[in-house]
Regions:
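Conserved catalytic core of the tyrosine transesterase superfamily
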Residues: 1-294
């Protein structure tokens, strides 16, 4: 049973070019399902029927899991069993007929322009850490790249003369422009700071931790949370918040949806269209608060 799950994980990485977060999420859902099966005396993933999956989803609901979690678990099982069917391991997909309650759409958290300015001002350029953090945050908001893409950047991916970065992810490459402030922050960091903190001359990573090695997701998460606290911003800021804000602010200022899709690296335009709904919701909230008859 574990072998099938491991093979599916490899398929997601190598064939579907899924992100590390997506793979981790799907495998976590599948392993939780596997544990539940073992606890209930079912040991073979290949002998599962639709009724079994429905019972598992009801079990998640009884445990107080949110509709979004239950829906995601169902999606993970549908994807896994679709893979099992396509691989010839199973004749049919038992999860295909599963129907879940539609989860209430949760829109991404967006920072206002003032909140972004306040957040980007937090790193103090008085030492190596301050210069590095300033460059990272400016780059993140300038490009809207994912945190996995940020920490995966190499020095050779940056062209400051032309003012862009080259971002390779999920088997595709895209070119994203930089505004002047981000170029300046990167120039200062690459020229004056990075050479002093890298552990070895052979280090290729653009951003390194204070031990001189490539920055980790966990390390960057701590940096984000630290500056949220010092800025006194009440909204929950995650590494993805600046990505969401980047897209929403571009759209708000008239950018073409297809251009935003290209910069974000979305395979499907529907993923980008969520920001249209975010802007509409914000306008409606403003209207309801300000209009005397609303």
């Amino acid at each position: 049973m574990a072998d099938h799950i491991a093979a599916y994980g490899s398929y997601l990485e190598q064939e579907k070019h899924a992100s590390a977060n997506t793979v981790s999420s799907y495998l976590r859902d599948l392993n939780q399902f596997r544990s539940w099966l073992l606890e209930n005396g079912a040991a073979d993933l290949r002998r599962i029927k639709t009724d079994t999956i429905n019972e598992y989803l009801r079990y998640l609901e009884r445990r107080g899991k949110s509709p979004a979690t239950v829906t995601r678990s169902a999606a993970s099982l549908k994807s896994f069993y679709g893979y099992m069917q396509a691989s010839g391991v199973m004749k049919a997909n038992p999860a295909k007929a599963v129907v879940t309650h539609r989860a209430e759409r949760k829109y991404p958290e967006i920072l206002t322009n003032k909140e972004v300015e306040l957040f980007l001002e937090q790193p103090r350029c008085v030492d190596e850490k301050g210069f590095r953090d300033h460059a990272m945050l400016e780059l993140l908001y300038a490009t809207g790249i994912r945190v996995s893409e940020l920490i995966g950047l190499n020095v050779t991916d940056v062209n400051l003369t032309a003012g862009f970065i080259r971002c390779s992810s999920r088997g595709k490459e895209r070119i994203i422009p930089l505004y002047h402030g981000a170029v300046k922050a990167l120039q200062d960091y690459i020229r004056d700071i990075r050479p002093r903190i890298i552990a070895a001359e052979t280090e290729t990573a653009l951003f390194v931790n204070m031990n001189g090695e490539r920055m980790s997701r966990q390390g960057f998460w701590k940096i984000i949370k630290h500056y949220q606290e010092t800025a006194g911003i009440e909204k929950d800021i995650t590494p993805h918040t600046l990505r969401h804000s980047f897209a929403a602010h571009l759209l708000e200022n008239g950018a073409d949806l297809r251009a935003i899709q290209e910069m974000l690296g979305h395979a499907d335009i529907s993923s980008t269209q969520i920001y249209t709904h975010v802007i509409q919701k914000q306008l409606k909230d403003i209207y309801n608060k300000a209009h005397p008859r609303a």
